[in-house]
A protein has these predicted regions:
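Non-catalytic, C-terminal membrane-associated alpha-helical segments of glycosyltransferases
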Residues: 106, 113, 120-197
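A recurrent flexible, glycine/aromatic-enriched loop bordering the glycosyltransferase active site
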Residues: 26-50, 62-63, 69, 111, ...
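Conserved donor NDP-sugar-binding/catalytic core segment of glycosyltransferases
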Residues: 1-12
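A short, conserved alpha-helix in the catalytic core of glycosyltransferases
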Residues: 45-47, 51-56, 61-88
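Short secondary-structure boundary/hinge segments and terminal tails
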Residues: 4-5, 70, 92-93, 122
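Short, flexible helix/strand-to-coil boundary loops that buttress conserved ligand/catalytic motifs
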Residues: 56, 93, 104
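Active-site donor/metal-binding and catalytic loop motifs
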Residues: 77-101, 110-115
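Short, flexible helix-coil linker/hinge segments at the edges of structured domains or between repeats
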Residues: 12-28
Length: 197
């Protein structure tokens, strides 16, 4: 659930990504759900410890999305992921467009370093379009003055993600500047492949 002080963009994001229907996701859902099969949030998650440890736990050096990484590993290994809509916690962010750019830059870096996730589960292109369409509809009904901010934020996310996907073409100081998680870059060295698998 969004925090009580969440702005309209944060409210919509929570409602869009965390629905009211309980789901059990498995390999069989990849065709229909794509990358949403492995979408989850560590802000309110539990893992079966034996499986978590058997699959190697979280990666040692990832910029973010360790929850998606682990979910993808579990689905690949034949396990299922449960989303329990009845359980609830308040978690949201009133990010500025700059902060959204930084977060999506880091998301792009994550996928550039872990291309196997999009290769095996698909990209987020269609889901991104569906999100933007839903957001505009939500704002038209509830907070129309936020539409310009939403459009700016969408552009910031798109640009950040695209730059993050090509982080190896950028100077390291630029990557650190663009990133929300700046300490990640302290131990990065360029190589022909940064895939973590």
């Amino acid at each position: 659930l969004p925090h009580h002080d969440a702005n309209p963009l944060a409210i919509h994001a929570r409602n869009f990504n965390y629905g009211t229907e309980t789901l059990i996701k498995s390999k069989n859902d990849i065709k229909n759900l794509g990358i949403k099969t492995v979408f989850m949030s560590n802000s309110f998650a539990a893992y079966r410890r034996s499986v978590f440890e058997a699959l190697g736990g979280f990666p040692e050096h990832t910029i973010l999305a360790e929850d998606m990484f682990m979910a993808a590993r579990m689905i690949q290994a034949g396990y299922k992921i449960a989303y329990c809509a009845e359980a609830s916690v308040r978690h949201s962010h009133n990010y500025t467009p700059k902060q959204e750019f930084q977060r999506y830059f880091d998301t792009g870096v994550f996928h550039a370093c872990n291309p196997w996730i999009q290769r095996d589960f698909g990209g987020a292109g269609g889901e991104g379009f569906r999100f933007v369409k839903s957001e505009i509809q939500f704002l038209l009904k509830n907070a129309p003055f936020w539409i310009p901010r939403a459009l700016l934020t969408t552009f910031a996310k798109f640009l950040g993600y695209k730059l993050g996907k090509h982080w190896q073409s950028l100077p390291l100081p630029t990557c650190r500047y663009f990133s929300m998680y700046k300490s990640y870059w302290n131990n990065i060295q360029y190589s022909s492949s940064k895939e973590i698998k």
